[in-house]
């Protein structure tokens, strides 16, 4: 019995030894995998550096590099692959290109940088995309990373600003191509200081140039807005002590085409039951519409269907009597404030023919108010002042 009890600790020790041996094997396998991954990464790094050094790749080396990239993506290094690519491969390669021309100035710098860009854009960049083809579909892409590193390490770390500012500088076409291509690459964090520095270089070779904060031109002053809005409500309601200036607005001639007036289609059933059965169905009849002056309000057609304009009556003015037979009242019956708004010769196109129906008259005048032959308008009425004088114009802005 004692021998059996004495042998039991030995059996448990055997189990522990087996577990320890298995753990050691696993650790050894992990170390071997890491060593293999490191060897694969070193081979990829050597291949990429040789491309930057104009040595090229050996036969079938591109295929082996593709397989190495696929293997690395399956290991624990896969999640850090982009970081390794930026901090090691691309940074080292760009430093190799920069060190060859970093001490040049003036015209020699422009010519040397043009040659460097041609080599990078035509040879290095396609080869990088081929080597890291298995990484495609991830953001940022290999192309974006390579161009961003070229911008930050080479373009913005040379005396390029001084070279472009010289009066007799001859800018090679490759320099303009380089700046415009780099300008089209954006980072996920938005506009950065490096991007703004790049735009300051583009202004020296491209004029006019539409940048992030406006239009740059050598012949005209800087325009502070690339999307110019003509805000009528600010011209109507200026703040105290503020001087407003009108920005130059370039309008498209296509906005000056005559507008289409809607056709009022009558439904007999609703007309009998409710007294008004108008619905807008289609468009016809080309009509040139002039902008209706602000201030006309409360146009009524008859006692059964009353449609009011988007204006406000002057204080103390009573409700006007209804108008019959689809005609407007004569101008001498209007109040003094309204007579100043109308002129028989100036506003004659706004007054419809007497034979028109009341509904068509109202539709035409509403369309003339809501439309403007000068441009496209967006309604921002909620964010404006609710002053009665500006109720019609206050919610309209012309967008160019």
UniProtKB/Swiss-Prot annotation:
What are the annotated GO cellular component locations? TORC2 complex
Compositional bias ranges of the Low complexity kind:
348-358
Pfam assignment, any one: HbrB
Cross-referenced InterPro entries: Bit61/PRR5, Cullin_repeat-like_dom_sf
The annotated regions of Polar residues compositional bias extend over 334-347
Q: Where is this region: Disordered?
A: 301-358
Q: Which GO terms describe its biological process?
A: TORC2 signaling
Describe its assembly.
Associated component of the mechanistic target of rapamycin complex 2 (mTORC2).
The entry sums up its family as follows: Belongs to the PROTOR family.
Q: What does this protein do?
A: Associated subunit of mTORC2, which regulates cell growth and survival in response to hormonal signals.
| Name the record gives this protein | Proline-rich protein 5
